[in-house]
């Protein structure tokens, strides 16, 4: 995981800065099966009872339309939890000063974006991601667009 201000990739942001904004990061070792126990512990501690998986690639029908929806600035009533099983993508979040922070997630990264935080999502140039989504209740994804 790497985070930086949207317009300056060399201005790296610390995990502490993300924590100040209630964005949480958990590295998971996807190269081994070792990630399963810490993942289950996290789910139990935070009350994540449900999950599903999403795969997007260049071959996904309607990919560009889906990506347009994900890239619209929005928030959710619930946390947005993503565990990247393969591929790479970017969460852009708004910090307390309304500045965009870009968070690059890759295989093995788990991020929790808090409820009611404006954000958006994009794929990297490979256009490939396989992510596990975690939920406290039934799996749902309801965006509340900013504009």
Swiss-Prot record:
Catalysed reactions, as listed in the record: 1,2-dihydroxy-5-(methylsulfanyl)pent-1-en-3-one + O2 = 4-methylsulfanyl-2-oxobutanoate + formate + 2 H(+); 1,2-dihydroxy-5-(methylsulfanyl)pent-1-en-3-one + O2 = 3-(methylsulfanyl)propanoate + CO + formate + 2 H(+)
Cystine pairings recorded for this chain: none
EC category name: oxidoreductase
Cofactor(s), by name: Fe(2+); Ni(2+)
Keywords carried by this UniProt record: Amino-acid biosynthesis, Cytoplasm, Dioxygenase, Iron, Metal-binding, Methionine biosynthesis, Nickel, Nucleus, Oxidoreductase
Pathway where this protein functions: Amino-acid biosynthesis; L-methionine biosynthesis via salvage pathway; L-methionine from S-methyl-5-thio-alpha-D-ribose 1-phosphate: step 5/6
GO MF terms held by the record: acireductone dioxygenase (Ni2+-requiring) activity; acireductone dioxygenase [iron(II)-requiring] activity; iron ion binding; nickel cation binding; oxidoreductase activity
Record InterPro entries: ARD, ARD_euk, RmlC-like_jellyroll, RmlC_Cupin_sf
Signal peptide coordinates: none
Enzyme Commission number, as recorded: 1.13.11.54, 1.13.11.53
Cofactor annotation comment: Binds either 1 Fe or Ni cation per monomer. Iron-binding promotes an acireductone dioxygenase reaction producing 2-keto-4-methylthiobutyrate, while nickel-binding promotes an acireductone dioxygenase reaction producing 3-(methylsulfanyl)propanoate.
UniProt main location, coarse: cytoplasm
Protein name, entry field: Acireductone dioxygenase
Lineage, uppermost ranks: Eukaryota, Amoebozoa, Evosea, Eumycetozoa, Dictyostelia
